[in-house]
Amino acid sequence: YFSNPLCIFGPDEPVPYPSASDQLDYELELAAIIGREGTNIAEKDALSYIAGFTIFNDWSCRDLQRDEMQARLGPAKGKDFATSLGPIVVTPDELEAWRETDPPRGSRWRLRMQARVNGKTLSDNNASTMYWTFGELIAHASRNTRLQIGDVIGSGTVGFGCLLEFPDGTHPWLQPGDVVELEIQPIGVLSTRVVGASGQEGP
């Protein structure tokens, strides 16, 4: 799906709690940033279009998303209110030591991925487990359309990289005042505080 490029938040930038939702969730993803324009990019050539990698928090309103997905259409209000990126962009050559080849599907990166809420670790997995490779994702995203410089391609949420994947009641939905930290080394930590819709923190 396509997200909203007008609602991008950087590292340490607070994210307002969406007023229409009661079920705010984080999503822990690795993101590739496109560095060359291209259309109908072949999987075998796709990595040459990546300028760098960063951490991607694909915030989601699960109650809105659940209602909207019944129509199987998009983009949707459960996804278009915020995307957090950062803290830095790491170039592909800087991650070469973590790259592993998965023929014939392309490359994956052995990067530990963790998520913490208010200092408690809730998610701990690895980017090497991502289902689709970035080669496959870029080839699909560029089919019959043009990828632009600066476009961001998310890996999809790593296993147990969001509250939705835990059994009901195990971990409550996010609230104003919560601090979400997503960590992928050697990229760093993307820290975000959730604030009230008007910018105030919760109790």
Spans of model-derived segments:
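A conserved acidic, glycine/proline-rich C-terminal tail/linker
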Residues: T133-Q175
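Charged, cofactor-coupling segments
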Residues: E68, K77, T83, P87-V90, ...
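Conserved S/T- and glycine-rich ATP-binding loop of Class I adenylate-forming
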Residues: A32, G150, I184
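Generic structural signal for buried aliphatic residues
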Residues: L30, I153-G154, V180
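Glycine-enriched loop-and-adjacent helix/strand subsegments that border the catalytic/binding cleft
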Residues: Y1-I138, N144, G199-G202
